[in-house]
């Protein structure tokens, strides 16, 4: 959150040059504050686990956040009771005419299926298109990031010969981006996917900016130049045991998965996992919610169709 300082304080220029978020008394006095409204489209099989992971990150920010949960269809989920879905989730028709400050679209275990062959692909495209007019900023995670890059920019992924699973080191490729404030020069994040985007296509696209990447895992955080869409190719929301649970699930199904890299102690699956990414995940979501949602969204969400703060904002 910003530090409020007197108007024309000499330190302001220095602090701003160091990428410290400060706000003058005049600007602070004219700020209207209300809870942020965030919609979560949960595509993961275990709905409750994913809800908990994302709400944990949202709850770690200093902002009040009102969350709505969205399902892609009303078909019964294999891993979540129909009572839970009916009690806590909304259908798209219930939110179609609403506006939100933020939208999070999760990953999905669909990495080896062509986008057009996904049973609800048309629904995904419809929601992505809707979000570009009804949401200030959208955070796409893993499969959703690949799907959105394909739908919005025509950039397709390449399938991998084996699942990329593990915790990988990443580096910043840009400086002085609000989204990267507080990031270490090198940080870790989990990946669990069967596909990868071509990093050179991402780097050369005029509407996209690669902010962080990994020598082992490729592009990680990509931001649209409009500031509206953030594509995160991994799973910063994962809890400590998630990769372990996925690995053991695949073993039980006879899939012969590779051991997640840089995850178990000494890369030995009989040892406990080592969580190296929780502080990064918390900071990523906090920065997104603060700088790309809270700072850009209109106070009256009904005004969203009449203004585009993300296109004129200088962050």
UniProtKB/Swiss-Prot annotation:
The active site is at 142 (acyl-thioester intermediate), 235 (proton acceptor), 237. It catalyses: L-homoserine + succinyl-CoA = O-succinyl-L-homoserine + CoA. Keywords: Acyltransferase, Amino-acid biosynthesis, Cytoplasm, Methionine biosynthesis, Transferase. The record marks 192 as: Important for substrate specificity. The keyword DNA damage does not apply. Belongs to the MetA family. Pathway: Amino-acid biosynthesis; L-methionine biosynthesis via de novo pathway; O-succinyl-L-homoserine from L-homoserine: step 1/1. It comes from the Bacteria. GO terms for cellular component: cytoplasm. Transfers a succinyl group from succinyl-CoA to L-homoserine, forming succinyl-L-homoserine. Signal peptide: none annotated. This is Homoserine O-succinyltransferase. It is found in: Cytoplasm. Substrate binds at residues 163, 192, 249. It comes from Shewanella piezotolerans (strain WP3 / JCM 13877). One of its GO terms (molecular function) is homoserine O-succinyltransferase activity. The keyword Cytoplasm applies. One of its GO terms (biological process) is L-methionine biosynthetic process from homoserine via O-succinyl-L-homoserine and cystathionine. The record marks 111 as: Important for acyl-CoA specificity.
